[in-house]
């Protein structure tokens, strides 16, 4: 890839996104050293925008900068996971409570449509784990959008980036797809019933169980 092929937005932002996807796909594995010279050559750029991109990823928690050693893909510890899931549970439970009382009927129908896609991706015998988790994230992002708090949205977006570093573990746990789907059904039922307290509780339980699957 050469620099000329990158989009018009700031070069370092484009490079950050390319690296972000390589980290999420585990092409760049947790704990691995990031070879700046090799990457700069691959992308046909100087090391300056690459270093700016690494600073962005470091701010997101995806990359760890070590003095005189360079940049490494962050390894997520058990404590990191506990902290991230705890905060996500608080933030998204609060959002679910807001949605239960303030969402329009049309907005709830949109969430129900996403939930049906989730059901379709989890049909026994033909379940698609990658698609399931992609739709799952869309559902959560849509719920946050309905709750309409940009500061919460930004915090959740950053936390979810760190969560993705460990997603492969939860994907591999036997039965997690079915468990997650049951939890989503309970969340959706509480939202449709306009039961704020139940929606908050079901969402909190969802993240508690998600942590157990990811650990």
Where are these regions (language model features)?
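Alpha-helix N-cap/N′ positions at the starts of helices
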Residues: 68, 91, 113, 179-182
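Conserved amphipathic alpha-helical segments that form helical-bundle/coiled-coil interaction surfaces
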Residues: 101, 105-169, 181-190, 198-209
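Amphipathic, non-transmembrane alpha-helical scaffold segments
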Residues: 12, 85-88, 132-136, 177, ...
């Amino acid at each position: 890839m050469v620099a000329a092929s990158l989009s018009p937005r700031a070069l370092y932002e484009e490079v950050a996104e390319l690296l972000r996807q390589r980290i999420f796909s585990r092409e760049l594995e947790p704990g691995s050293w990031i070879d700046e010279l090799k990457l700069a050559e691959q992308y046909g750029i100087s090391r300056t925008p690459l270093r700016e991109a690494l600073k962005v990823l470091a701010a997101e928690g995806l990359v760890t900068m070590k003095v005189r050693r360079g940049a490494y893909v962050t390894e997520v510890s058990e404590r990191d996971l506990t902290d991230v899931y705890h905060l996500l549970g608080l933030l998204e439970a609060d959002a679910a409570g807001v949605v239960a009382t303030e969402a329009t009927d049309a907005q709830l129908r949109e969430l129900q449509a996403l939930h049906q896609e989730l059901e379709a991706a989890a049909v026994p015998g033909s379940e698609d784990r990658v698609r399931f988790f992609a739709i799952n994230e869309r559902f959560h992002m849509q719920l946050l959008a309905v709750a309409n708090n940009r500061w919460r949205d930004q915090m959740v977006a950053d936390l979810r980036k760190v969560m993705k570093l460990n997603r492969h573990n939860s994907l591999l746990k036997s039965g997690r797809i079915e468990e997650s789907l049951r939890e989503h059904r309970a969340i959706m039922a509480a939202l449709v019933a306009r039961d704020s307290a139940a929606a908050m509780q079901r969402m909190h339980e969802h993240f508690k169980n998600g942590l157990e699957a990811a650990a």
